[in-house]
């Protein structure tokens, strides 16, 4: 482990020497090229994952079962559903869709980048001397608070997709009447043999957290959109203040 840390220290030193020549760039000047690229990839992959998740959550054609359609109309986009011959007595058989697999893959990729950045930035924040004491406090507090929030939501979302298996939740109409939990985030309400889905408390919490994190990361995506250039960002900020 010490050899790995020594090697990372050597790499970081070289990166900072190069970055010092480009000090006008906001992220690159502080964290180096590798961490900046990983951070950008994380923001991008998480943003796409979160938007896809919200599209699936707010999909209007949700779980619907009644005497008229004798089947299932839509299923969130997350899963593929196999319609049984006897809809009211047979099990619902469904598997994760390509849409769900894409979210699952992006979520795992985002989680990997978050863990990687947490380790890399721990070295930069607590071992390196290129940043001041107050920068260390601000960056460490803000970043590791973000790490907990992001990882918690990604873990919830991954569990939601993985636990769609029949073994975890009931799959017949008889069972759904006594146990309305269709999945980790959704419950089933029924009236006169018409079944419809609603977000449960955990699903509502996960959705609210997802929206909050997306809004939180928008300013950071904006900084990357301006090429991380401090002078350009400062000029825009000063122009707005004068107006």
UniProtKB/Swiss-Prot annotation:
Primary location recorded for the protein, binned into one broad class: membrane
GO cellular component: plasma membrane
Record membrane topology: Multi-pass membrane protein
Name of the protein in its database record: Uncharacterized protein MG323.1 homolog
Organism: Mycoplasma pneumoniae (strain ATCC 29342 / M129 / Subtype 1)
Keyword Transcription: no
Keywords from the UniProt entry: Cell membrane, Membrane, Transmembrane, Transmembrane helix
TM spans (from-to): 38-58, 99-119, 143-163, 204-224
Subcellular location: Cell membrane
């Amino acid at each position: 482990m010490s050899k790995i840390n020594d090697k990372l220290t050597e790499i970081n030193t070289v990166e900072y020497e190069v970055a010092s020549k480009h000090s006008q760039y906001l992220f690159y000047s502080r964290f180096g090229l590798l961490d900046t690229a990983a951070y950008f990839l994380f923001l991008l992959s998480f943003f796409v994952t979160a938007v896809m998740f919200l599209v699936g959550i707010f999909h209007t054609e949700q779980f619907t079962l009644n005497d008229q359609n004798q089947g299932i109309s839509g299923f969130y986009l997350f899963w593929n559903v196999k319609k049984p011959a006897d809809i009211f007595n047979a099990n619902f058989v469904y598997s994760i869709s390509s849409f769900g697999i894409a979210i699952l893959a992006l979520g795992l990729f985002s989680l990997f980048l978050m863990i990687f950045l947490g380790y890399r930035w721990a070295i930069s924040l607590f071992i390196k001397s290129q940043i001041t004491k107050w920068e260390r406090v601000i960056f460490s507090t803000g970043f590791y608070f973000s790490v907990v929030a992001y990882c918690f939501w990604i873990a919830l979302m991954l569990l939601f997709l993985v636990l769609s298996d029949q073994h975890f939740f009931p799959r017949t109409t008889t069972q759904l009447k006594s146990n309305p939990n269709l999945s980790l985030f959704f419950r089933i309400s029924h009236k006169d043999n018409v079944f419809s889905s609603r977000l449960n408390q955990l699903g509502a919490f996960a959705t609210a957290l997802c929206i909050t994190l997306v809004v939180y990361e928008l300013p950071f995506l904006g900084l990357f959109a301006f090429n991380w250039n401090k002078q350009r960002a400062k000029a825009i900020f000063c122009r707005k203040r004068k107006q």
